């Protein structure tokens, strides 16, 4: 069962400036927290389309929101196919779109999914369990250079080379099969003083592998551009990120789409293709309140950014 504490619930949904008869998209259904609150704001003419790659999340939401009938539509798909899937439903524009980019707590708390460094489990980490690439493949098949690159780029791990060396040496004799084995190798690769600071020593490498397995950054960048195109003028996009890499993509995409490029001086009018598509609703990200942080430790790295289509 999905018992998931939703982060920045009211801020994210209220930030969409809900029109009761509008059409909205939740790109990250998960435990259905944002969807539940959003549906409660809609009248009979309104509808919500919710995306998730996880079959359990989809089935859970169908049961939970069955009373909404045709107002609630689920799509089992990666949100990288946002435009295509909406067009298949005959939808060409919407009033608002939200993304919550955190791994949902049920995925973290289900040991066999392999997302958590707190449980010993098979190395999996796939959001979509039908996808071919697993964490096992990355850890056992990717070269030393590839591992260093993802640990450094996606995990911002200072000891990327040392950890990759430990993995490379170990797998010469035996495949690395579980999260527990991987955690021990990561610990061995990090000097003892550094192991005692900055949270769990495996946190950054696990993040990096998860991002690589699910191609998360590229997928998000493409989907955010699609969302900006799909939203009507006056409609909004709300995005919750949980690490600096995602936040950087969101910030730069919103900024690029909300500023006018340098044009030759003296132009009588700005051509349409150079006019900004967006207006920033949040100049700086909205952060969880102290009360929310006390209730939900997983909210501590969350940042919310909102933009409106011009």
From Swiss-Prot:
EC top class, as a word: transferase
GO cellular component assignments: cytoplasm
Organism (species): Bacillus cereus (strain Q1)
Entry protein name: Ribosomal RNA small subunit methyltransferase H
Assigned protein family: Belongs to the methyltransferase superfamily. RsmH family.
Primary role: Specifically methylates the N4 position of cytidine in position 1402 (C1402) of 16S rRNA.
Keyword Metal-binding: no
NCBIfam families, sorted: 16S rRNA (cytosine(1402)-N(4))-methyltransferase RsmH
Gene that this sequence comes from: rsmH
Entry keyword set: Cytoplasm, Methyltransferase, rRNA processing, S-adenosyl-L-methionine, Transferase
A biological-process GO annotation: rRNA base methylation
Catalytic reaction equation(s): cytidine(1402) in 16S rRNA + S-adenosyl-L-methionine = N(4)-methylcytidine(1402) in 16S rRNA + S-adenosyl-L-homocysteine + H(+)
Entry keyword annotation includes Cytoplasm: yes
PANTHER family: 12S RRNA N4-METHYLCYTIDINE METHYLTRANSFERASE (PTHR11265:SF0), S-ADENOSYL-METHYLTRANSFERASE MRAW (PTHR11265)
InterPro entries per UniProt: RsmH, SAM-dep_MeTrfase_MraW_recog, SAM-dependent_MTases_sf
